[in-house]
Amino acid sequence: MVSWRRFCWHYHGWTLGCYMLLAIIALKLSLRLKCDFDVMDLDSKEFQSQYCRDLLYKTLELPAKSSINCSGVIRGEQKAVTQALLNNLELKRKRQSFTEADYLSMTADCEHFKTQRKFIQVPLSKEEANFPIAYSMVIHEKIENFERLLRAVYTPQNIYCVHVDQKSSETFQQAVRAIVSCFPNVFIANKLVSVVYASWSRVQADLNCMEDLLQSPVPWEYLLNTCGTDFPIKTNAEMVKALKLLNGQNSMESEVPPPHKTFRWKYHYEVADTLYRTSKEKTPPPNNITMFTGNAYMVASRDFIEHVLSNSKARQLIEWVKDTYSPDEHLWATLQRASWMPGSDPLHPKFDLSDMRSIARLTKWQDHEGDIENGAPYTSCSGIHQRAICVYGSGDLHWILQNHHLLANKFDPKVDDNVLQCLEEYLRHKAIYGTEL
């Protein structure tokens, strides 16, 4: 400081400028000291400063893997979307995903792993800290997909149960265990099952996590269930606000079944290597319950989950649907219309809720794609289709972010990593600044 004073005194014409410079330096240092990232509330006075937010964003900013214009892609600018799609075609074959061995190596030092991979390690607001969310995450392959999904939804106040398919490779299971071991609020389900597509085992995986999550000391109020091809399209803060607005109600697809879907519970199904239908007809549903259809995904209150596991009528329905086709697509939808389930909706068709009106999951179905001006609910998929569902491409991101859902399905970095990269960048920026890119 003495040398600065002598310098300023010697060049007295610069005195005012020198002291202004010193004041700016002192202010920046004081701001740095006030940016307490260990006890953080983005709504607090100190984090209203651009400096603190910039510093936090720089710490948590995800490394860009390509030079695409994510802001343009998010706004739906055709030039940016075209460049992103072309860039994806160029890099798709060259891109190397992280392997199980990579994660086993990275997680040898958990603190370094969490810092290097930019996990958010403190609640970003008091509102979020006081409203933890429970996750049931059912996965079976693609370790990088799982880690990126976990990173996108992770906050230290939430609680995460991971169900790993029992028939997944041993190296995959080891890598999942290694990742999970780095977080005190992430755990593997106590009971694992071998999941067969469209069979009861898919529901059982979620039920196993539900049981474990209810045993957790974390006072969560809502549960979201995910699979390995899901990704959030809202920040944790936005999710908390949406869940509070539900005020104890659930949100999941539940509609009167079309005639072609009723066969799913009219016949007995059995599992060999796959699920197959027998000629044996089933008895009617128990308690004269009315059947509804929906999908596997839910936004469900804690009370609803507790009743799923303990209510006698719910347990009878669970037993009855075990030998049906794709029971996850009618069990939750039917329970959501049962008057004895908390947060449910009445039976009347006016209370039907489509997947587009529910907030649980945003999906583009191939047979509904088309020209919006001619009545289609959404435009064509810019990625590819898998089992008649769009695996999103960069051209879908603008549309995705216009919707109110909490998560979307399906994403796959091997199909289009740019759409995921831009979505990750969007979510991280919005989590810190509260604004879009």
UniProtKB/Swiss-Prot annotation:
Subcellular location: Golgi apparatus membrane
UniProt pH dependence: Optimum pH is 7-8.5.
Any one of the GO BP annotations: protein glycosylation
Residue stretches spanning the membrane: 7-27
Topological domains annotated Lumenal: 28-437
Topological relation to the membrane, as annotated: Single-pass type II membrane protein
Recorded catalytic activity of this chain's protein: a 3-O-[beta-D-galactosyl-(1->3)-N-acetyl-alpha-D-galactosaminyl]-L-seryl-[protein] + UDP-N-acetyl-alpha-D-glucosamine = 3-O-{beta-D-galactosyl-(1->3)-[N-acetyl-beta-D-glucosaminyl-(1->6)]-N-acetyl-alpha-D-galactosaminyl}-L-seryl-[protein] + UDP + H(+); a 3-O-[beta-D-galactosyl-(1->3)-N-acetyl-alpha-D-galactosaminyl]-L-threonyl-[protein] + UDP-N-acetyl-alpha-D-glucosamine = a 3-O-{beta-D-galactosyl-(1->3)-[N-acetyl-beta-D-glucosaminyl-(1->6)]-N-acetyl-alpha-D-galactosaminyl}-L-threonyl-[protein] + UDP + H(+); a beta-D-Gal-(1->4)-beta-D-GlcNAc-(1->3)-beta-D-Gal-(1->4)-beta-D-GlcNAc derivative + UDP-N-acetyl-alpha-D-glucosamine = a beta-D-Gal-(1->4)-beta-D-GlcNAc-(1->3)-[beta-D-GlcNAc-(1->6)]-beta-D-Gal-(1->4)-N-acetyl-beta-D-glucosaminyl derivative + UDP + H(+); 3-O-[N-acetyl-beta-D-glucosaminyl-(1->3)-N-acetyl-alpha-D-galactosaminyl]-L-seryl-[protein] + UDP-N-acetyl-alpha-D-glucosamine = 3-O-[N-acetyl-beta-D-glucosaminyl-(1->3)-[N-acetyl-beta-D-glucosaminyl-(1->6)]-N-acetyl-alpha-D-galactosaminyl]-L-seryl-[protein] + UDP + H(+)
Keywords noted in UniProt: Disulfide bond, Glycoprotein, Glycosyltransferase, Golgi apparatus, Membrane, Signal-anchor, Transferase, Transmembrane, Transmembrane helix
Mod. after translation: N-glycosylated.
Keyword hit for Transferase: yes
Record-level Gene Ontology MF annotations: acetylgalactosaminyl-O-glycosyl-glycoprotein beta-1,6-N-acetylglucosaminyltransferase activity; acetylglucosaminyltransferase activity; beta-1,3-galactosyl-O-glycosyl-glycoprotein beta-1,6-N-acetylglucosaminyltransferase activity; N-acetyllactosaminide beta-1,6-N-acetylglucosaminyltransferase activity
InterPro entries in UniProt: Glyco_trans_14
Function: Glycosyltransferase that can synthesize all known mucin beta 6 N-acetylglucosaminides. Mediates core 2 and core 4 O-glycan branching, 2 important steps in mucin-type biosynthesis. Also has I-branching enzyme activity by converting linear into branched poly-N-acetyllactosaminoglycans, leading to introduce the blood group I antigen during embryonic development.
PANTHER family cross-referenced by the UniProt entry: BETA-1,3-GALACTOSYL-O-GLYCOSYL-GLYCOPROTEIN BETA-1,6-N-ACETYLGLUCOSAMINYLTRANSFERASE 3, GLYCOSYLTRANSFERASE 14 FAMILY MEMBER
Name of the protein in its database record: Beta-1,3-galactosyl-O-glycosyl-glycoprotein beta-1,6-N-acetylglucosaminyltransferase 3
Organism field: Rattus norvegicus
